[in-house]
Curated annotation (Swiss-Prot):
Taxonomic path: Bacteria, Pseudomonadati, Chlorobiota, Chlorobiia, Chlorobiales
Gene: rplR
GO CC aspect terms: cytosolic large ribosomal subunit
Name of protein: Large ribosomal subunit protein uL18
Subunit structure: Part of the 50S ribosomal subunit; part of the 5S rRNA/L5/L18/L25 subcomplex. Contacts the 5S and 23S rRNAs.
Segments forming a coiled coil: none
Similarity field: Belongs to the universal ribosomal protein uL18 family.
InterPro entries according to UniProt: Ribosomal_uL18_bac-type, Ribosomal_uL18_bac/euk
Protein purpose: This is one of the proteins that bind and probably mediate the attachment of the 5S RNA into the large ribosomal subunit, where it forms part of the central protuberance.
GO molecular function annotations of the record: 5S rRNA binding; structural constituent of ribosome
GO BP annotation list: translation
């Protein structure tokens, strides 16, 4: 499967699932983006069009983290979950953004669940 086919396949899956996954201020959308070397996660309120929280491997407080990519994703998910709980957010809607629920995406979700987020 060529790189173009993979990208267009992911975009189709993303477009299909976006109709079903909607975040509110009470239950925001946990959106995950995975690049080859980094991972980004955001809590988004789709009703108001605002990003509530964000965490990534590129943020300043995570620049000194060491470990495998999956371990870093679990840490990022845990940090995002703790920040969300501090703001009073307990339930979220998980948006895998067209990526398979496997590997780093699953590790981030597991880290967020360990922190106490419900989805």
């Amino acid at each position: 499967m060529s790189q173009i086919d993979k990208a267009s396949r992911r975009q189709k899956i993303k477009d299909r699932s976006r109709g079903n996954v909607q975040g509110t201020s009470a239950k925001p959308r946990l959106c995950v983006y995975r690049s080859l070397s980094q991972i980004y996660a955001q809590l988004i309120d789709d009703v108001n069009g605002k990003t509530i929280l964000a965490a990534s491997t590129l943020s300043k407080d995570n620049s000194a983290l060491k470990g495998s990519k999956s371990e870093l994703c679990r840490i990022i998910g845990n940090q995002l979950g703790q920040k969300a709980l501090a703001q009073g957010i307990t339930c979220v809607v998980f948006d895998r953004n067209g990526f398979r629920y496997h590997g780093r995406v699953k590790a981030l979700a597991d880290g967020a669940r360990e922190a106490g987020l419900i989805f």
